[in-house]
Amino acid sequence: MSETPSKAKASKPAESKAQASDSSGANQYAIVEASGQQFWLQPNRYYDFDRLEGEVGDKVSLKEVLLVSGKAGASLGQPYVKDAVVNLKVLAHRRGPKVIVYKMQKKKKTRRKNGHRQELTRVMVESITVGGKPLS
C-alpha cells in the first residue's frame, strides 16, 4: 500500500477588506448636464469640460443637475433636481490632444489632412448643494 500525503489544513483566506476612504466626498456625487454631455462629479476632484466662460480662479455654478446622491440617499430630477447646484472653480484653460483627420480618394491623387485640438476648461468641484445646504 502506498501512503498518501496528509493534506495540510486549508487555511482561511486572509480576511482583508478593501476599506473605502472615509473622506467627506467618498460616496457623494452628482450627475450634471454641461456642454451637451452628462458628467459624474464628486467633490474635490477636477474635470475637463468643453470651454466654459470665465477666467482662471472664477467660480462657476451648474444648475442642470440630473441626480444627486449622498449619505441620506439619492434624489433623481425630472428632468432636473430642484434647488440643486454644483459649484466649480476654474483651474485652467487648456487644449486637448491633437486629432488628425486624413481623407483620401484612391487612384485620384486627392488627399486632405486636417488637425483639430479641442478647447477645454479644467475645473475643480468645490461643493454640491441641495436647497442651499451642502450635500452630506
From Swiss-Prot:
Biological process terms in GO annotation: translation
UniProt cross-references to InterPro entries, sorted A to Z: bL21-like, bL21-like_sf, Ribosomal_bL21, Ribosomal_bL21_CS
Statement: the UniProt record of this protein carries the keyword Cell division: no
GO CC entries: cytoplasm; ribonucleoprotein complex; ribosome
Single GO molecular function: structural constituent of ribosome
Keyword Hydrolase attached: no
Residue ranges of the region described as Disordered: 1-25
Highest taxon above the source species: Bacteria
Keywords, alphabetical: Ribonucleoprotein, Ribosomal protein, RNA-binding, rRNA-binding
Function statement: This protein binds to 23S rRNA in the presence of protein L20.
Assembly mode: Part of the 50S ribosomal subunit. Contacts protein L20.
Classification via PANTHER family: 50S RIBOSOMAL PROTEIN L21, LARGE RIBOSOMAL SUBUNIT PROTEIN BL21M
Name assigned to this protein: Large ribosomal subunit protein bL21
Source organism (scientific name): Synechococcus sp. (strain RCC307)
Taxonomic lineage: Bacteria, Bacillati, Cyanobacteriota, Cyanophyceae, Synechococcales
